[in-house]
Amino acid sequence: MSALDATQAALAAEHAAVYGYGVVGGRIAPERRAEATAAYEAHRARREVLRRAVRDLGGAPVAAAAAYGLPFRVGDPAGAVRLAAVLEDRVAGVYSDLVRATEGPARREAAAALREAAVRAVRWRGGDVTFPGLAERA
């Protein structure tokens, strides 16, 4: 996978995560709302970084879809927490591809994004995975 393709895939994943956190925010329990808001803002910031990176690589940033399918129905706070963990796992998987496809500063940035997503996933899930970013590949 080229650096441009991997960056576009990461951008698409961030678009989906921003959408997903909109759903999470609507169902999350009040005591976890600040955590959901912080994650939403982190994904928005990463999305902007990736848009610039795509342009720097000579591409046109992939646009966000109007809506995204969710992996399951989110009808209560527990479902919102579960969705947040899934979103982070998916983003981590895409960032693991970006780490493999890039080098230098871009690789360091992708590794930092992978680490941040893995930490958020652990916080949402309450447990970790052996190899963050590879759970989606299993």
Set out the residue ranges of the language-model regions.
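All-alpha RGS (Regulator of G-protein Signaling) helical domain and cognate RGS-like helical scaffolds
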Residues: 1-138
